[in-house]
Amino acid sequence: MDIGVDLGTSNVLVYVKGRGVVINQPSVVAYEKNSKRIIAIGNKAKKMIGKTPESIEVVRPLVKGVVSDYTVTERMLKVFIRSAMEKRTGVGRPKICVCVPSGVTEVERRAVEDAVYRTGAKSVYVMEEPLAAAIGAAVDIEEAKGNMVVDIGGGTTDIAVISLGGAVESQSIKAAGDDYNASMIRYIRRKYNLLIGEQTAEKAKIAVGSVYERPEDITYVVKGRDLIKGLPKAITITANETIEAFADTTSHILTAIHGVLETAPPELVADISVNGIV
C-alpha cells in the first residue's frame, strides 16, 4: 500500500509510505449554501464552527462513522489525498488502504470505497479500524493469541477481540468522543445555566475530562452565555465534576466491552486477562 487513510468522524489522518503521517486534519468542510462552493476544509473550517453567517454552512460529512454526505466527503478526500500524493516519492496512481468502523454495512463500506476510488486511486483496500489500531500498536495480529482492542473515536467506539489476523468478536457502538462533548454541554447547561459551544466543550474535555477520580483535582475556566441574563459568563469546572458529566457515555462503552468479552471464546478471554486491553 502506498497511502493509508483513517477516515474518522472527527479527524482524517493520511499516511504516506516512507513519510509517515503527512495529514492530520478535522473532518470538517465549510461551503457556500447557494453555490455549494467549498470555502475551507480541515482546521480552517473547524475554526468557523458556530461563527458563520447564514450564507455559509459548516458540516461534518461523516456522522457516527458513516458517510452522511457523499458529495462533500468525496471532495474533502480529494483535497487531502491529492495533497498527500504530492508528498509521495513514487509515481503512478497509488494503492490506498482506508479504515472503517467494524459495524459498517456493505452499502456504507462501498460508499467509502467508491469515494476513495474517485480521488484517483489505482486500488482500494478497506480495513476495519480495530485491526488497523492493533497493527499500529505493534500487536502481532497473526498470532494464535487473543488481543482486545478498544478504539474510541469521535463518532464510534470499535471493540474487537483479534486472533489469527481477524476479528473473532467485534462491536461498533455510536458512543464516543463527540458524545463526551455533548455530555459536557448538557452538564454545564444544567448545573450552571451556561450555554457553551461544541469547540469550548471539546477544549474542556481535553483539558480536564476524566472518567475516574484523580488524586489532584485540576480545574479549567469555561466561557459561554448566561442563559438567565443573556450575558457572557465564565465558570470554573473541575476534573472530578466531569466524571458525573461523562457517566452515561462511559457506562455505554463499558457495557459494550463486557458484551464482547462475554461472547468471545474462553481461551481468547484467558489471553486477554494476561495481555490486557489495547
Regions found by a protein language model. Give the residues of each.
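Nucleotide/phosphate-binding catalytic cleft detector across ATP-hydrolyzing
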Residues: M1-I152, A160-V278
